[in-house]
């Protein structure tokens, strides 16, 4: 199983994210994933730069490490035609190292354009139509599309890479795993649940499965404190996380998440063993790759510890 690194824009400035990407490549991570938010989850996180500008810089600052969005929502804040153009551009800038992770989004980021927040089944319809538009535009011809949710009028992309970015689709249930199997090239999921992977495979999905694990390297008690302060929202679950409209709502909703509750979703401290155990759960569920999220500001110490301690503790090539 490949181990990656998360460029989490909700907690880092644009320049820091580019520096983090370089450091992650030097530290031996197999790939990068980048969140795509307008807002942080919690006010204390304090950042949320425009991911696509950061990715252009990452493409130039790194040399060989693959990277993806984790994930971009192409249904409200971004029109799918614009997503098609910027994904094609980043693929060209990175010499073919980019892949496009897509999902049905969160109200947190999408409500800002004032178009409301559709029910999840409608968002999945919109996502399916958006993928259709993106792939059509990557064909390099003029595209006119008059669909149920989107209109495209005589659009053409003039800079399209020879090798198109693979499209991953985030899923947590049967409707979205079917969408990922039918229209995506790989599956994205954040929980090590075998039933998600099996649903994807049963629907005909043959691509790899990519997950994500929150971690916090550091002295154990302090690391748990940082994890709880900045990442307690992860204990709410995605059915809640997709619906809340802003940082104040997440602050309130997560007020009763206790530090010990995070043991279900995260690893922390300086001992590689808890990290390896959490990664093993993903491997046993059928995941092919997992990106670690180092919560908090200590990115350089974490990368050094990964290279010196965690990576060697795993099987060769960063595989648990």
Locations of the language-model features?
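Active-site-adjacent structural elements that line small-molecule/cofactor binding pockets in enzymes
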Residues: 1-320
């Amino acid at each position: 199983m490949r181990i990656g690194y998360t460029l989490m824009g909700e907690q880092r400035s644009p320049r820091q994210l580019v520096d983090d990407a370089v450091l992650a490549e030097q530290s031996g991570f197999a790939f990068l994933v980048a969140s795509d938010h307008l807002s942080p989850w919690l006010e204390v996180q304090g950042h949320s730069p425009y991911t696509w500008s950061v990715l252009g810089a990452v493409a130039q600052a790194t040399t060989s490490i693959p990277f993806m969005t984790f994930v971009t929502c192409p249904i409200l804040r971004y029109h799918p035609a614009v997503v098609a153009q910027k994904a094609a551009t980043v693929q060209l800038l990175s010499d073919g190292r980019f892949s496009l992770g897509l999902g049905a989004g969160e109200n947190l980021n999408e409500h800002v354009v004032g178009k409301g927040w559709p029910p999840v089944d409608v968002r999945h319809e919109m996502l399916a139509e958006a993928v259709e538009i993106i792939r059509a535009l990557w064909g390099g011809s003029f595209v006119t599309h008059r669909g149920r949710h989107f209109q495209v009028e005589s659009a053409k992309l003039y800079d399209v890479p020879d090798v198109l970015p693979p499209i991953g689709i985030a899923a947590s249930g049967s409707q979205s795993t079917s969408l990922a199997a039918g229209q995506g090239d790989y599956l994205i999921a954040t929980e090590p649940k075998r039933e998600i992977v099996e649903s994807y495979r049963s629907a005909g999905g043959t691509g790899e499965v990519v997950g994500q694990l929150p971690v916090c390297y550091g002295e154990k008690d302090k690391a748990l404190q940082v994890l709880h302060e900045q990442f307690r929202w992860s204990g709410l679950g995605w059915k809640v996380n997709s619906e809340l409209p802003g940082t104040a709502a997440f602050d309130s909703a997560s007020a009763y998440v206790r530090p010990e509750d995070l043991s279900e979703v995260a690893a922390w401290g300086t001992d590689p063993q808890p990290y390896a155990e959490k990664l093993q759960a993903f491997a046993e569920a059928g995941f092919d790759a997992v990106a670690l999220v180092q919560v908090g500001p200590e990115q350089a110490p974490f990368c050094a510890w990964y290279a010196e301690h965690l990576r060697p503790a795993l099987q060769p090539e960063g595989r648990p």
